[in-house]
Every structure is written in C-alpha cells, then in structure tokens.
Amino acid sequence: SLKAAALGGESFFVNEFIAQEDGCTLGLTGNMLGDIEVIPVTDEFIVQSGAFVGSSGDLTLDTKWQGFTKGIFGSNLFMLKTVGTGDMFVNAWGGIIKKELQSGEKMILDNYQLVALSATADYRVTKHGSLKTTLFGGDALVIEIIGPGTVYLQTKNIMEFARALIPFLPQRR
C-alpha cells in the first residue's frame, strides 16, 4: 500500500502473483545477504520493514510506529505489522534463529538483530551504558523483549558488516 511505501520503506508498488494452475512455483529473494524464513502467522506479527519480503493468505500489512527513541536511535523509523492468517516471508542478514519466550521470560538484543516478533510479546528500547556511549557510540540501545511470544533474530549485524568494509573502501582525496 502507499502507506506502507511511504512509512515503511517498502516499494510504492505491491506485486500480486496469482497461479493460473496448480503446481506453480514462485521464487522470492530479499535484499539482504542471508536466509529467507517462512513464518506462519495466525494473529499479529511485527516485522522490521526492511526484512519483509512478502506474504500469502489473508494477511493485511500495516505500518506500526516505533516511537521517537526507536526511530532516532534504531535501524528503522517504522516497523510493519501483519494481521490475519497466512505465511509471511522475511529476509535477514545471515541466518535466522527462532526463539520461543515463555510468559515473563526476557531477551535483550541489539536493535539490529531483531527480524520479527509475535505481537503477544512486549518490547521496548532501553539504554545500555552511559549517555556518552548512547550519543557517540551508536550501539548503546538494545531491545528488551518480554514473553510470551515468538522472536526471530538474525545472526549477522548490518552495522558490523558496514564497519568491516570501511578499510577496503577507496580513500577520499
């Protein structure tokens, strides 16, 4: 939708593919160097906007405001929310790990590691370290997720990948 495109970083065009006969295959690819995971959705799921590849079934895609802190210090200003029943396809940097959180169980991870989580889990961005680290280090905020819920995280970090490439880039003159 246009709303998802303007706010979620997705393409302004949503492609719809309809099989003309049984047994057809559709190939999907993401823009990140890593796995694509199929997540069965039966209610609501929250996904990083850059990780969303597509969906099937009766899923509705909408944007979900992350909040000021998450938008300023996080990797995306918006996350996407899927509502309904169907399969959601997500892409990640590296591999994708699925973690089931029990009620009250807590997981803390770097903002760049989150791919998706079920809406049954509570999440918030919290500061880790000093204010100086937060303002100048860029990696001082983490996501705290509290179960119950399902969390999908990626094994690689785009910011670490970008930092690793810097020594190989041509120098400005």
Mark where each language-model region is:
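Phosphate/adenylate-binding glycine loop and adjacent helical scaffold
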Residues: 1-173
